[in-house]
């Protein structure tokens, strides 16, 4: 009997013939970006994160072309006019969108695409094309409030508005394929990784 040696649960041949789109969504401050970076670090040959387009200004430490493609409102409108965006959303006064060309670019590399996007965007994509939707949730509303406060990126009325929006987002969790409670980062990552491995081996016939 021939032995099959498996160094990775992800098959390059399977990724090339059957590339998938994963969407990961969560209220602000829950840890979705950190979890995706952990996944990319361990399985860089299997996955790549899509780079969204946004009109908002870069935050401290963000790198244009790596974290986001930062554009003006006029440039964003031109993308809409050309129907270049698979999905887009207007959120807190700024626009965010995902380009189908960006997803296809990742697929052409023989990798699965991972889009870390707003909940509205994830549900819209799900209605238009096959995708695996994952929702990252906080362990409690109190913990969500604490994490939002610790971010320090919003103050006063902005933080209140962000919290109210986050509570609305939590109510949409049951519309996703998977829900992960991020109470412990390492445990949440183990669950996330198991989902990706299971989806890699899902029978699509």
UniProtKB/Swiss-Prot annotation:
Enzyme class: transferase
Coiled coil, from the record: none
Subcellular location(s) of the protein: Cytoplasm
Domain Guanylate kinase-like: 19-197
Substrates-to-products reaction catalysed: GMP + ATP = GDP + ADP
Binding site for ATP: 26-33
One GO molecular-function entry: ATP binding
Keyword Kinase: yes
SUPFAM superfamilies, A to Z: P-loop containing nucleoside triphosphate hydrolases
SMART domains attached to this UniProt entry: GuKc (SM00072)
Keyword terms of this UniProt record: ATP-binding, Cytoplasm, Kinase, Nucleotide-binding, Transferase
One term under GO cellular component: cytosol
EC number: 2.7.4.8
Function comment: Essential for recycling GMP and indirectly, cGMP.
Family the UniProt entry places it in: Belongs to the guanylate kinase family.
Protein name, entry field: Guanylate kinase
Organism of origin: Chlamydia pneumoniae
Upper lineage: Bacteria, Pseudomonadati, Chlamydiota, Chlamydiia, Chlamydiales
């Amino acid at each position: 009997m021939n032995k099959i040696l498996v160094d990775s649960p992800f098959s390059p041949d399977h990724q090339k013939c059957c590339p998938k789109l994963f969407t990961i969504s969560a209220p602000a401050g829950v840890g979705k970006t950190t979890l995706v970076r952990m996944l990319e670090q361990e399985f860089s040959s299997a996955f790549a994160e899509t780079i969204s387009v946004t009109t908002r200004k870069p935050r401290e430490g963000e790198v244009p072309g790596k974290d986001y493609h930062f554009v003006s409102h006029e440039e964003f409108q031109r993308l809409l006019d050309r129907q270049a965006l698979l999905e887009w959303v207007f959120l807190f006064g700024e626009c965010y969108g995902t380009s189908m060309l960006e997803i296809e670019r990742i697929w052409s590399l023989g990798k699965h695409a991972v889009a870390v996007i707003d909940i509205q965007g994830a549900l819209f994509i799900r209605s238009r094309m096959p995708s695996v939707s994952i929702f990252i949730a906080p362990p409690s509303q109190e913990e969500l409030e604490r994490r939002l406060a610790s971010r320090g990126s919003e103050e006063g009325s902005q933080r209140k508005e962000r919290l109210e929006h986050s509570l609305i987002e939590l109510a949409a969790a049951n519309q996703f394929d998977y829900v992960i409670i991020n109470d412990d980062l390492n445990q949440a990552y183990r669950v996330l990784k198991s989902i990706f491995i299971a989806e890699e081996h899902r029978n699509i016939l």
